[in-house]
């Protein structure tokens, strides 16, 4: 009896080809996962160091001046901590939150590889929130650092303090730079996430 199927046409191969093609769209490849994993590890390291450096920033120095009451030369010991500034405290809290989120998202992205595509949108939204959090805290901390470096006599009557507490200002500025690098890493993560969403569609 003559076969009803056309020669050379294999139904199973055709279905398998379509399934394989569909699987390529849904399942993320290791080449697309690796940059995201590396960037999250970088963000973990940078935010951790930033929070520790900023939180531990303090300096004790001896200030010499003339007593206004006695008109005599006097010396006092002054200790300044980063936690005296609300902006610096906000910086530490923000970096700690981003650090914990980075750890959790890294674990989820490595454990649930099969469901990584379905989690791309939540990850992208959360990553964008981390970008906003980092940039806002970095901006607040940088503004206070500028005042500490240059003073603000015209509006608030604040004197500059970095000429007396140079070590404190150096550590604060280093923490801000590291946190800015972490925010750049998250910007790249958001771009990768949007690209993966577009590719999956």
Swiss-Prot record:
Extracellular-side segments: 58-87, 149-173
Membrane topology according to the record: Multi-pass membrane protein
Subcellular location: Cell membrane
Parts of the chain that traverse the membrane: 37-57, 88-108, 128-148, 174-194
GO cellular component entries: plasma membrane
Pfam family, one: CASP_dom
Cytoplasmic compartment spans: 1-36, 109-127, 195-201
Transmembrane found in the keyword field: yes
InterPro entries reported in the protein's UniProt record: CASP/CASPL, CASP_dom, CASPL
Record keyword Nuclease present: no
Coiled coil: none
Top-level taxonomic group: Eukaryota
Keywords: Cell membrane, Membrane, Transmembrane, Transmembrane helix
Family: Belongs to the Casparian strip membrane proteins (CASP) family.
Quaternary structure and interacting proteins, as annotated: Homodimer and heterodimers.
Protein's UniProt name: CASP-like protein 1E1
């Amino acid at each position: 009896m003559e076969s009803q199927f056309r020669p050379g046409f294999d139904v199973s191969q055709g279905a398998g080809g379509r399934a394989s093609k569909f699987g390529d769209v849904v399942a993320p490849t290791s080449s697309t996962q690796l940059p995201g994993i590396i960037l999250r590890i970088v963000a973990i390291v940078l935010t951790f160091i930033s929070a520790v450096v900023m939180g531990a920033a303090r300096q004790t120095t001896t200030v010499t001046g003339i007593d206004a009451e006695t008109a005599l030369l006097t010396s006092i010991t002054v200790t300044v901590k980063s936690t005296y500034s609300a902006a610096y405290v906000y910086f530490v809290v923000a970096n700690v939150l981003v650090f914990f989120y980075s750890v959790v998202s890294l674990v989820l992205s490595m454990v649930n590889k099969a469901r990584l595509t379905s989690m791309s949108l939540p990850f992208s939204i959360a990553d964008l929130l981390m970008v906003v959090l980092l940039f806002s805290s970095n901006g607040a901390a940088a503004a206070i650092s500028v005042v500490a470096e240059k003073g603000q006599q015209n509006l608030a009557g604040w004197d500059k303090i970095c000429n007396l507490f140079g070590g404190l200002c150096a550590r604060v500025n280093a923490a801000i730079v590291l946190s800015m690098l972490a925010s750049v890493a998250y910007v790249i993560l958001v771009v990768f996430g949007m690209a993966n969403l577009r590719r999956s569609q």
